[in-house]
From Swiss-Prot:
CC terms in the record's Gene Ontology section: cytoplasm; membrane; nucleus; plasma membrane; vesicle membrane
Domain of life assignment: Eukaryota
Gene3D superfamilies reported in the protein's UniProt record: Annexin
Annexin repeats (start-end): 15-86, 87-158, 171-243, 247-319
Organism: Drosophila melanogaster (Fruit fly)
Assigned protein family: Belongs to the annexin family.
Pfam families from the UniProt entry: Annexin (PF00191)
UniProtKB keywords: Annexin, Calcium, Calcium/phospholipid-binding, Repeat
Comment text on domains: A pair of annexin repeats may form one binding site for calcium and phospholipid.
Listed InterPro entries: Annexin, Annexin_repeat, Annexin_repeat_CS, Annexin_sf
Entry protein name: Annexin B10
GO molecular function annotations of the record: calcium ion binding; calcium-dependent phospholipid binding; phosphatidylserine binding
Length: 321
């Protein structure tokens, strides 16, 4: 089944960057800020259009739009709006960098960003990360992770995965399924290196075939095998790859659910997914969320510990309930 991503944010038409720039300036000028105007303009435009508005704003007012937004806004609402103003790949690089900065590493964020990307998407992230932070992503990651988890992420980041233009090969899928079976359920202990190699090298369409063949061969799903054979971060990373191969929308729907159903709300994850998927497949994620959890994502965000302009910005990005 081919994945059909549907976004919630698209190009606005008609589009007048100069008028938008003036509306934004008026919303931030003088005493107080008109947050609703900011939401209406920036959520209602695509990222490319926001970059045009930013350029026009600077040309017309000799001011930096993002700096003005940072001065006027605060807290989680600012995080959403500033996130929307960043080119998508830069935004993900910033999130990766933040996940590895300071004490401890947010492995779940690394998994969410790195294990869900095609090789083509990964190449862009690697290039922008190094340009922005003057350090290769693989090197930074190696210093923050360890063991087979580090090995898997390193393989993914170094771009060994076959591109989407590589034809799927049923014969090879049978062979890869047999290798996974021999490396896991068919033996005492687990040969993680075999799992790492196949999970990081094969394209997503090829892996879909491998997982089907695995079920035929072993009578078990690949998820069951991973649950038995892996633990901790490696388990999470493998499961993320499997979920994204089968349905990226289901993977992100589950991540959003967990972000809102723990002790308190994981705002960073909530913001990152809603902002970064809004122009890719957020509409599809909404449909999957409702299918899996029997409630709308819109209502879940409204009921989560979100409030004020922050809540309004998130629900605006989600589009119609």
């Amino acid at each position: 089944m081919e994945y059909k991503p549907v976004p919630t944010v698209k190009d606005a038409a008609p589009f007048d960057a100069s008028q938008d720039a003036q509306v934004l300036r008026a919303a931030m000028k003088g005493f107080g800020t008109d947050e609703q105007e900011i939401i209406d303009v920036l959520v209602g435009r695509s990222n490319q259009q926001r970059q045009t508005i930013k350029a026009v704003y600077e040309a017309e007012f000799e001011r930096d739009l993002v700096d003005d937004l940072k001065d006027e806004l605060g807290g989680k609402f600012e995080d959403v709006i500033v996130g929307l103003m960043m080119p998508p790949v830069e935004y993900l690089c910033k999130q990766l960098h933040a996940a590895m900065a300071g004490i401890g590493t947010e492995e779940a964020t690394l998994v969410e960003i790195l294990c869900t990307k095609t090789n083509e998407e990964m190449a862009q992230i690697v290039a922008v990360y190094e340009e922005r932070y003057q350090r290769p992503l693989a090197e930074q990651m190696c210093s923050e992770t360890s063991g087979f988890f580090r090995r898997l992420l390193t393989l993914i980041v170094t771009g060994v995965r076959d591109g989407l233009d590589t034809p799927v090969d049923v014969g090879q899928a049978k062979e890869q399924a047999a290798q996974l079976y021999s490396a896991g359920e068919a033996k005492l202990g687990t040969d993680e290196e075999v799992f790492n190699r196949i999970m990081s090298h094969a394209s997503f369409p090829q892996l879909r075939l491998v997982f089907e063949e695995y079920k035929v061969l072993s009578g078990q799903t690949i998820e069951q095998a991973i649950k038995h054979e892996m633990s901790d971060e490696l388990h999470e990373a493998m499961m993320a790859i499997v979920e994204c191969v089968q349905s990226p929308a289901a993977f992100f729907a589950n991540r959003l659910y967990k972000a809102m159903n723990g002790a308190g709300t994981d705002d960073a994850t909530l913001i990152r997914i809603i902002v970064s998927r809004s122009e890719i497949d957020l509409e599809t994620i909404k449909q999957e969320f409702e299918r899996i959890y029997n409630r709308t994502l819109h209502s879940a965000v409204v009921d989560a510990e979100t409030s004020g302009d922050y809540k309004r910005a998130l629900t605006a990005l989600l589009g119609s309930a």
